[in-house]
From Swiss-Prot:
Similarity section: Belongs to the universal ribosomal protein uS13 family.
InterPro entries: Rbsml_uS13_C, Ribosomal_uS13, Ribosomal_uS13-like_H2TH, Ribosomal_uS13_bac-type, Ribosomal_uS13_CS
Superkingdom, natural source: Bacteria
Entry's Gene Ontology cellular component terms: cytosol; small ribosomal subunit
Alphabetized NCBIfam families for the sequence: uS13_bact
Pfam family membership, one: Ribosomal_S13
Quaternary structure note: Part of the 30S ribosomal subunit. Forms a loose heterodimer with protein S19. Forms two bridges to the 50S subunit in the 70S ribosome.
Name of the protein in question: Small ribosomal subunit protein uS13
């Protein structure tokens, strides 16, 4: 089982799919990474050689922030917006949608379960 960026990649999946198990690497970045290292996207994870694994590891570490570093960066960005008091920071603080979605109806994921108000009948 190959281990990249602190993540165990699934054994029987194609490399193109297996790389997306790493936080910060989606389908497009996985394809770009395989092209840079010269590894076939159709190759299965358990067929990787040690040289290929080290090549992937080197490119990932040199090029992008992934996993813990990326998660810390995102959290720090959110914390900074909250501290400076910008609109997005206020929305984060109040637990409401940040990117301009409507909240009169919907937005239940951010707002949590519906709170019923007593005495609101016809």
């Amino acid at each position: 089982m190959a281990r990249l960026a602190g993540v165990d990649l699934p054994r029987n999946k194609r490399m193109e799919v297996a790389l997306t198990y790493i936080y910060g690497i989606g389908p497009a970045r996985a394809a770009q990474l395989l092209e840079e290292t010269g590894i076939s996207p159709d190759l299965r994870t358990d067929n990787l050689t040690d040289e290929q694994v080290s090549a992937l590891r080197d490119v990932i570490e040199a090029t992008w922030k992934v996993e813990g570093d990326l998660r810390r960066q995102v959290q720090a960005d959110i914390r900074r917006k909250i501290e400076i008091g910008c609109y997005q920071g206020l929305r984060h603080r109040r637990g409401l949608p940040v990117r301009g979605q409507r909240t009169k109806t919907n937005a239940r994921t951010r707002k949590g379960p519906k709170k019923t108000i007593a005495g609101k009948k016809k």
